[in-house]
Amino acid sequence: MASIIKFTALSGAKDESPPCYLLEIDDFCILLDCGLSYNLDFSLLEPLEKVAKKIDAVLLSHSDTTHIGGLPYVVGKYGLTGTIYGTTPVLKMGTMFLYDLYENKMSQEEFQQYSLDNIDSCFGEDRFKELSFSQHYSLSGKGKGISITPYLAGHTIGASVWKITKGTYSIVYAIDYNHRNEGHLDSLQLTSDILKPSLLITDSKGVDKTLAFKKTITRDQSLFEQINRNLRDGGNVLIPVDTAGRVLELLLCIENYWSKNKSLALYSVVFLGRFSFSVCQFARSQLEFMSSTASVKFEQNIENPFSFKHIKILSSLEELQELPDTNKVILTSSQDLETGFSRELFIQWCSDPKTLILFTQKIPKDSLADKLIKQYSTPNGRGKCIEIVQGSRVPLTGDELLQYEMEQAKQREEKRLEQLRKEQEEREERERLEEEEREQLLNATNQDQLQQLLQLQQQKERGIIDDSMVHMKNPFENDRFDLLDSEFKKQSMITMFPYFEKHLKWGEYGEEDDDLILRNQDKKVEEVTMEEDEIQEQEIPKKIITQTLRLPINCKIQTIDYEGCSDGRSIKAIIQQIAPTKLVLIRGSEQQSQSIENYVKENIRTKGIYIPSIGEQLDLTSDTNVYELLLKDSLVNTLKTSKILDYEVSYIQGKVDILDGSNVPVLDLIQSIPINNNNNNNNNNNNNNNNNNNNTTMMTTTTTTTNGHDESFIGDIKLSDLKQVLVNAGIQVQFDQGILNCGGLVYIWRDEDHGGNSIINVDGIISDEYYLIKELLYKQFQIV
């Protein structure tokens, strides 16, 4: 039977908010991305609170905060436990994105929405499943029968277009892809595996975008012209970038340009970030996910493209200040100037008219970078002031420092007393257990002595022994030696009542002395306390201060497109090439989504186009029923199959039956027909009602008869492709208002029935040309 497919947009619908979607296949729940906005608006994640614990899997398409930024929050606060799937670069670079975001926020405020432990729990080996491109992975448990596959999407390293398949129903989830090859990444690969899916989920936010440069070479030249001009004019260049995504393309371009222009050695290029070393290290180890150009360069020159010779990698502003006093090109996060070193350098350099701030990515609306660009683009915008609120950590001084040290000393003393209290409780517990053991031993000894006295008293009453024999000692028994044994065996001395044997404790090096243990434990506590005191003395206590700054904008501001996403024309062409049966449009304004919807209706045959709102649930269940049957050998041997995509298709006429002792239906040739034996129901209704309810017999036919069937033409062909086939056969063809005119004798046009199925009409004069054209047309399909 058909799977029940439901789709809910939790965020990123009819606007450009971060992507976060819930896809339900029967009772299996998949979360598609879990993004966070630039201003860290965690209220956008509130819809996840009700569904987080029922999510079974999370598919991550990209590694930046726009796609994974909310994941630690949902894991830490809402208790998401599902397995997370993504490529290896998404794992590595995603960790860097989240670490950098956390540290940047902590440098400005007390960020408590999630911790570093929450980030680590998202990407732990027990939680995150790494996949390679085109790797088919079959889910288990509740997801049995569902397979997921990531395909190359471009844009950022490891970015994926996901294909989710169950039975014959396939879903393609594709957002933020790039159709152009770049220095370190290949473009989106439209392989046959992702064409003609049952459902395509894609974004429409870039449909109104146009390419400023038709070639990447022209784009690179424009970038370096601006950088060269500003450096030679004596100014610095600040390029706000992301942490570990699009910055890699910029680094590669700048490194190649600097290596070809020796005169630029006078100027420094710096990749500045708290985790910039780790980002470059991970990039060097992920060549398999990069472009073929990068791989070939490594194989031929044995030189990793991300082993930079002309770019300095620094992790703090203090290291930047130690560089020679020359003009610099600084690439640092974040790209929106909301956090990180880019914001701090902007505050320092914005008043310098020689400084150039170069934005290379799309800027989030209402961010500091967006306000800056809008002000700069207005008449006389340069020179005006802009107000920002800046938080920073400063060392404590005076009374605040004294109060802090007193609180820390108090906490250390409380911790020490708590440690001593726990140790005292442990000692008391050990003593209590030893006392219980002694009492149990004493009770057992008293019982044995009482039993012996009773036996002696009974023997005395019977006259077996007298009082003298009771006190007689066996001469063959000795306290230290057994004279009855073949040799003397030394026995240990056993303490007698009221003294008890002490239970000795053994460690790695033999018997332990209690007093020595206690002294060592006290010494360890003192050592730990001393170490903590030393650590605390090394750390300089700081506090967050917030101040409002009024900054004059005298610097120069330029933008250039290095976003690495497809433009509107390419988006429409890609959707047309994928040719989905159903289409869901997300992440775009209503006007952008409407533009794609109109284009699809005019150029693609679909059974439904959906533009959901946030919180709206779509029922996308297929109208095709799928059944699993066992085929008998007698039936399989008669099949004549045709290869269509990944399937073998054949038309059969058979009978479904369920064998005795089995619940699996079996399909066999039509040789017998089951009928209900109800002939005598009217006569024996009162007497045999219960016996006739389930009475079924088989009426066997002597021969297998079939009435044949109408041929089914399976496949699809464009009229433009058919025109080329006819031209190659020597037939004169031309388009006339959507109709193929074949020499004025035969006309071919396309139509649709009420179900949306394609119909190709052929009309014309009966002639040799007519039959030839019909034969060529038939060859374009599989006929069953």
From Swiss-Prot:
Region (Disordered): 676-695
Family: Belongs to the metallo-beta-lactamase superfamily. RNA-metabolizing metallo-beta-lactamase-like family. CPSF2/YSH1 subfamily.
Subunit structure of this chain's protein: CPSF is a heterotetramer composed of four distinct subunits 160, 100, 70 and 30 kDa.
Keyword Phosphoprotein set for record: no
Domain of life: Eukaryota
Alphabetical list of InterPro entries matching this protein: Beta_Casp, CPSF2, Cpsf2_C, CPSF2_MBL, Metallo-B-lactamas, RibonucZ/Hydroxyglut_hydro, RMMBL
Keywords: mRNA processing, Nucleus, RNA-binding
CDD domains, per database record: CPSF2-like_MBL-fold
GO molecular function: RNA binding
Known function: Component of the cleavage and polyadenylation specificity factor (CPSF) complex that play a key role in pre-mRNA 3'-end formation, recognizing the AAUAAA signal sequence and interacting with poly(A) polymerase and other factors to bring about cleavage and poly(A) addition.
GO cellular component, one term: mRNA cleavage and polyadenylation specificity factor complex
GO biological process: mRNA 3'-end processing by stem-loop binding and cleavage
Protein's name in the database: Cleavage and polyadenylation specificity factor subunit 2
Protein source organism: Dictyostelium discoideum
Compartments (UniProt record): Nucleus
Database matches in PANTHER family: CLEAVAGE AND POLYADENYLATION SPECIFICITY FACTOR SUBUNIT 2 (PTHR45922:SF1)
